[in-house]
Amino acid sequence: MKLPQPRNLIIGVVIALIVVGMGLVIAQDQETLRVRTSLATSAEAYPGYLAKLTGHALTSGDRYTVLTNGDAAFPAMLEAIHEARHRVAFEGYIFNSTSDIARQFTDAFVAAAGRGVDVRLVFDSLGAKVSSDDIERMTKAGCHIGWYNKVRSRAIEEVNYRTHRKALIVDGEVAFVGGIGIDDQWARDMDKEQRCRDTHVKVAGPAATDIEAAFNENWIETGGVVEPDVVPHDPNPRGPASSIVIWSSPEGGTNALKLAYLLSLAAARQSIDIQSPYLITDASTEWSLTDARRRGVRVRMLVEGDVTDAKPVKFASRAQYGQLMQQGIEIYEYQPAMMHTKAVIVDGTLSIVGSANFDNRSFELNDELNVVVFDRTVAERLRGDFERDLGKSRRLDLQSWRSRPLHIRAREKIWSLFGEIF
């Protein structure tokens, strides 16, 4: 099955630039960041510790709802837009306006603007496919549209820097983040082999304020203006969870998102469960995973199987599986559909969910948006989904892996050379 995704276009353009010598580097020596931490004194202190080190605020009083697949996410998101009273903010990498589900979102945006709601939309200029008719319709209704990082002929290398975020914020009080794009491959009426297995979360409470702040940064980046009346305010507490909203940008200096992952892996004492379509680790993340195994932590990674939207990235990912399995890390390939969930569960208490894949592109190149959630109920729900997905997956065997045909190993090794741009 072929899933038409802009990631393949990005890969092709960037590789072409490398080939013609325009200064992009395939690989370079990087200092390995080795992170260790300790929860020996108090596990309760860890959220504040993580917030201080990443430079992002810790909120409390958040209520999370896990939304498994578009079946659950789309109705909840559309209902929130229909109920909006003051403002709607949306940032998306994938928005295919010709799809049935995107038409429903377009209708909802238009209807909200028509009743006086301030509707602001940020689309990635490469990933989103919005027809001129839909742009005109939304604009005439009063929607404000910004295009992230338009590709310019004099700065063609900027094609490599995208907003990969998937976020919806309503009235500064409720927000949705995760991996689900606005396209029919996430919709319920698609054939199961053409669908994406994915996860979103809905959060009501103070964390929604920080998600809106992340949106405002990119809204300004696209040329938009943030008026005083849309500056986020702290909504009332809604639930028992504490959380840290972490957003990243290639222009933002130290990558707080990557640091959050490394610190969370270092904090694990029992288990680490990772879901990500792509698995391209650098020296720092590989060290953190293997160090966890040395501490006796069980590490399971659930990745895409035969159904993929980017074969070169899949080949590059598979080149690393052997060395990870050799350290005792369990790797499973999801079989029924494309695995697109981006989630990490640590010790059944800490969860990370959002738009970031477990790869270099998400950690170093894309604008991403994730939430770190400290709530056992959320972690248990995500782990339940993880276990169900394992039942539809194939575990890779190290001995069989080492017996792969030479041409397959060579293909994977060649594509792994481009790992830092994937």
Predicted regions: what they are:
Residues 2-422:
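Charged, low-complexity intrinsically disordered terminal segments
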